[in-house]
Amino acid sequence: MKVILLRDVPKIGKKGEIKEVSDGYARNYLIPRGFAKEYTEGLERAIKHEKEIEKRKKEREREESEKILKELKKRTHVVKVKAGEGGKIFGAVTAATLAEEISKTTGLKLDKRWFKLDKPIKELGEYSLEVNLPGGVKDTIKIKVEREE
C-alpha cells in the first residue's frame, strides 16, 4: 500500500515522502497513530503546496533576518550601566538587557535568544557579540558597555 508520511518515521522515511509499505503495517500502525495517510494524488498535491508555502516563509524569514543584521552591523551599540570604581558593573549585562537596549536605539524588535553570551558581561569595555538570527543568519556585532553618567 502506498502512503504519504505525515511525520518522520524511523527506518521508513521523512515527512512528505511517498512510501510503499505492507497493508497491515499501514492500516494497523502508521495510519491509526497519525504517522501516515493513504496515498491519493490530491493529498500529494496538498502536501507539495504546504512545502512550497513553508519554503517561501523560510525565505521571507531569512530576508528579514538579513535586513536586521545589516542594520545591527551599521554601528557599535552602546549600553549604559551603573558601575563602580575600577569598571565593575553593578549587576550584569545579559542577552535580555542587550536586546532591550539595542531595540530602543534602533527601533528593531529583537529577541534575547538571538544574542549568544557565554556568560553575562560584568565589566565596562568593548565586546564582539555573536548574533544568531532566524533563517540561519549569523554574524558578530560590536557593543560597548559604558558607565551611566
From Swiss-Prot:
Q: What would you give as a GO molecular function for this chain, any one? A: rRNA binding
Keyword NAD attributed: no
Q: Which GO terms describe its cellular component?
A: ribonucleoprotein complex; ribosome
The record's annotation in InterPro entries points to: Ribosomal_bL9, Ribosomal_bL9/RNase_H1_N, Ribosomal_bL9_bac/chp, Ribosomal_bL9_C, Ribosomal_bL9_C_sf, Ribosomal_bL9_N, Ribosomal_bL9_N_sf
- Tell me which UniProt keywords the record has, alphabetically: Ribonucleoprotein, Ribosomal protein, RNA-binding, rRNA-binding
GO biological process terms held by the UniProt record? translation
Q: What is this protein called?
A: Large ribosomal subunit protein bL9
